[in-house]
């Protein structure tokens, strides 16, 4: 166990996409490519030996757990997995107290929880970097992986159009932060009553955000079309109501045909074929979903390396 400090100066967290600068995001994405190349060559990359990652899950997960756990082991570290069922988090211990204790024993923490304020309270009392594995408000690790995937397949995302079709959830708000930082335009189409919250987004210029009532218009000329489930965790009681409201927001072959001829399709998974996307699209030639899922691991490895070791030259 090392002292709970980083080698790149002041303590840094990744609670929102904008917690890193555009140049730092670019560095992490470059490192993700290098780290992935080493992984594909079976070349060991273990800069985090003797480091420990604590993963705190208050929301269930498949990809987040596997990608962080496998990634930390591959970099030579160890992992502790905590849930509300097997820790004091489920027994009313204040999150601040958990942060004070856990961060004295590990080197970095990933939390997947409900309210953004909860992870912010943890980070405010942590002595080590804290990563947002998902909250109701933001999903920055997923967008980091998505942008890495786009670059891998099509090159720079700057100047491109990303079309978001479906619920204005944590993914869409994180895409908006990325668009503001990295110089691409976000097209958003949602059903009435499920739009982006004006109080949260402010007044971004059309070069950053355009909102559409018609999902076909949102997809017009897009270089990346992406979506998510219609009913996120915590909203299960609204499932039937949402299925009716979102019926016309299923990404299908017609929407992809409206996009740029070289457009790719992404989905953060799990997917419900026949709801937010057709099987023809997610299993078709424009889909890069499976690379996108794998790239969670590589992007997060680069992120953890950066938060703990700083930039490596």
UniProtKB/Swiss-Prot annotation:
It catalyses: carbamoyl phosphate + L-ornithine = L-citrulline + phosphate + H(+). L-ornithine binds at residues 170, 228, 232-233. It is found in: Cytoplasm. It holds the Pfam family OTCace. The gene is argF. This is Ornithine carbamoyltransferase. Pathway: Amino-acid biosynthesis; L-arginine biosynthesis; L-arginine from L-ornithine and carbamoyl phosphate: step 1/3. GO terms for molecular function: amino acid binding; ornithine carbamoyltransferase activity. Its EC number is 2.1.3.3. Its main location: cytoplasm. Carbamoyl phosphate binds at residues 61-64, 88, 112, 139-142, 268-269, 296. SUPFAM superfamilies: Aspartate/ornithine carbamoyltransferase (SSF53671). Gene3D superfamilies: Aspartate/ornithine carbamoyltransferase. Reversibly catalyzes the transfer of the carbamoyl group from carbamoyl phosphate (CP) to the N(epsilon) atom of ornithine (ORN) to produce L-citrulline. Keywords: Amino-acid biosynthesis, Arginine biosynthesis, Cytoplasm, Transferase. Belongs to the aspartate/ornithine carbamoyltransferase superfamily. OTCase family. It is an enzyme of class 2 (transferase). It comes from the Bacteria. GO terms for cellular component: cytoplasm.
């Amino acid at each position: 166990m090392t002292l709970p400090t980083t080698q790149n100066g002041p303590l840094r967290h990744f609670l929102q996409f904008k917690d890193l600068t555009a140049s730092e995001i670019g560095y992490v994405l470059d490192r993700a490519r290098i780290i992935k190349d080493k992984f594909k060559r079976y070349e060991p990359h273990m800069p985090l030996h003797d480091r420990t990652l604590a993963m705190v899950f208050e929301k269930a997960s498949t990809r987040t757990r596997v990608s962080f756990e496998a990634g930390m082991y591959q970099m030579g570290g160890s992992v502790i997995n905590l849930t509300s069922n097997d820790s004091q988090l489920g027994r009313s211990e204040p999150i601040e107290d958990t942060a004070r204790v856990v961060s004295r024993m590990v080197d970095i923490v990933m939390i997947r929880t409900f309210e953004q304020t909860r992870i912010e309270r943890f980070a405010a009392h942590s002595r080590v970097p804290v990563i947002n594995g998902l909250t109701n408000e933001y999903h920055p690790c997923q967008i980091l992986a998505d942008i890495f995937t786009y670059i891998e397949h099509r090159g720079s995302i700057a100047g491109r159009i990303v079309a978001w079709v479906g619920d204005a959830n944590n993914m869409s708000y994180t895409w908006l932060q990325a668009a503001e930082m990295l110089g691409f335009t976000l097209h958003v189409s949602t059903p009435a009553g499920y739009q982006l919250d004006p109080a949260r987004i402010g007044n971004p210029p059309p070069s950053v955000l355009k909102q559409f009532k018609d999902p076909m218009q949102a997809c017009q000329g897009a270089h990346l079309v992406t979506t998510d489930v219609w009913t996120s965790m915590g909203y299960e009681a609204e499932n039937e109501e949402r299925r009716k409201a979102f019926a016309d927001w299923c990404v299908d072959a017609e929407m992809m045909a409206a996009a740029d001829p070289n457009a790719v399709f992404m989905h953060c998974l799990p997917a419900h074929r026949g709801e937010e996307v057709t099987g023809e699209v997610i299993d078709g030639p424009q889909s890069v979903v499976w690379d996108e899922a794998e790239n969670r691991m590589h992007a997060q490895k680069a992120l953890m390396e950066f938060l703990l070791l700083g930039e490596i030259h």
